Every structure is written in structure tokens, then in C-alpha cells.
Regions:
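Membrane-proximal alpha-helical signal-transduction linkers
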Residues: 176-189
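Cytosolic-side ends of inner-membrane transmembrane helices, especially those
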Residues: 29-36, 162-178
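Extracytoplasmic ligand-binding sensor domains of the Cache superfamily
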Residues: 59-113
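Juxtamembrane loop-transmembrane helix junctions in multi-pass integral membrane proteins
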Residues: 3-9, 31, 35-38, 136-139, ...
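Extreme N-terminal signal-anchor transmembrane helix of membrane signaling/transducer proteins, especially
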Residues: 5-33
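N-terminal membrane-entry
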Residues: 13-18, 31, 145-162
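Juxtamembrane membrane-water interface segments immediately C-terminal to a transmembrane helix
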Residues: 32-57, 68, 72
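Extracytoplasmic
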Residues: 43, 48, 52-59, 99-150
């Protein structure tokens, strides 16, 4: 002998699971939106490091008295909170962290050249330094794309699970509620 369960209780459980999946989708969407803002800012700031390093070379050649204040600005960009946050993210790939550390180390040497107005040495190192910055920007972009792919995949799987669950609830209601009502209606005629 098997125990009969309440149809309404069973349907309520299925609908509760649907609500849980909707909560997951909503939470993930909010996390992705918040993350995108900081990712875009990190890419923007790190991309500006290229232009700032070239501008610093021009400043060294044309107006050496402004070099120190441009070095301070560059250092502020290099140590921006959003870039430091990327370094501390739990899931940030090691490539991003290594690229950022490489830029920090290389910049210490580049800033020394700028401070003592060694234009030739700064110029000689500039192209490879900018390549390191480009590599860092590329790593950030790839990480952002990977996060998007993961988020979209989770959203799609959740939506498919919701669709499957709702389809099952409809089928179950037809079998357990609608069919017996139809049989009762036919029997009463």
C-alpha cells in the first residue's frame, strides 16, 4: 500500500523550487551588473596607463618641471582601488595578478628613469613596458569575457530548469487534478 500525498502540497513544493531558481537568476544578474562596472573601470584605467606613459616621455622632453606631478598622477592610476581589488579577487586568474605585478615592478624602474630625466633609457624601455600594459589589459578583458560566459551559462541552465519544472507541474496538474475532474464530470452526466 502506498501513501497518498496532497496534490496541492506537491505542486507548492515544485513552485517553491521555481522561486528558488528565480532567486538564483536574480542574484546572479545583480552580481554580474556590479562586477561589470568595476571590470570596465579596471580596463579603462589600465588602458590609460599606455597613454600616460607616452605623455610622460613627451613631458620629460618638453617640460621637465611637470614630470614629478605626472608621476604622481600615474602612480595614482597604477594603484587605483579597482586595480587593487582585481588583485584580491578570489577567482581572478593568476595571469592577471602576475601581469599586474610585472607592471608594478617595471614601473618602479621606469619612474626612476623619469625622475632623473634619463630620457634615452625611458624611451628604450617604453615599448616593452607598454606591451606589458597591453598584456594586462588583454588579461582583464579575457577574464571579463569568461565571467560573462559563466554567468550566461548559469542563467540559461536555470531558465531551462525552470521551464522543465513548470512543464512538469502543468503535466502533473493535468494528471492529478484535471483528469479526475473530467472523469467526475462524465460520471455525473
Amino acid at each position: 500500500m502506498y501513501a497518498k500525498r496532497s496534490v496541492s502540497t506537491r505542486i507548492a513544493k515544485y513552485l517553491f523550487v521555481v522561486i528558488i531558481f528565480m532567486g538564483i537568476i536574480s542574484s546572479l544578474s545583480l552580481i554580474v551588473m556590479a562586477s561589470n562596472k568595476s571590470d570596465a573601470e579596471a580596463i579603462n584605467i589600465s588602458g590609460s596607463l599606455r597613454m600616460q606613459s607616452y605623455r610622460l616621455l613627451t613631458e620629460m622632453e618638453r617640460s621637465p618641471d611637470t614630470v614629478e606631478q605626472n608621476l604622481v598622477r600615474y602612480q595614482d592610476s597604477l594603484n587605483a582601488n579597482v586595480l587593487l581589488t582585481v588583485q584580491n579577487q578570489l577567482f581572478a586568474p593568476s595571469g592577471i595578478k602576475a601581469s599586474y605585478q610585472k607592471i608594478l615592478q617595471r614601473w618602479m624602474m621606469m619612474s626612476d628613469f623619469a625622475r632623473v630625466h634619463q630620457i634615452e633609457k625611458y624611451h628604450a624601455e617604453l615599448k616593452s613596458y607598454v606591451q606589458d600594459v597591453d598584456d594586462f589589459v588583454l588579461e582583464l578583458q579575457r577574464f571579463t569575457e569568461l565571467k560573462w560566459i559563466i554567468a550566461v551559462s548559469v542563467l540559461c541552465v536555470s531558465m531551462l530548469l525552470i521551464l522543465a519544472m513548470v512543464s512538469y507541474v502543468i503535466w502533473y496538474m493535468k494528471r492529478e487534478v484535471v483528469k479526475p475532474l473530467e472523469l467526475m464530470t462524465k460520471a455525473s452526466m
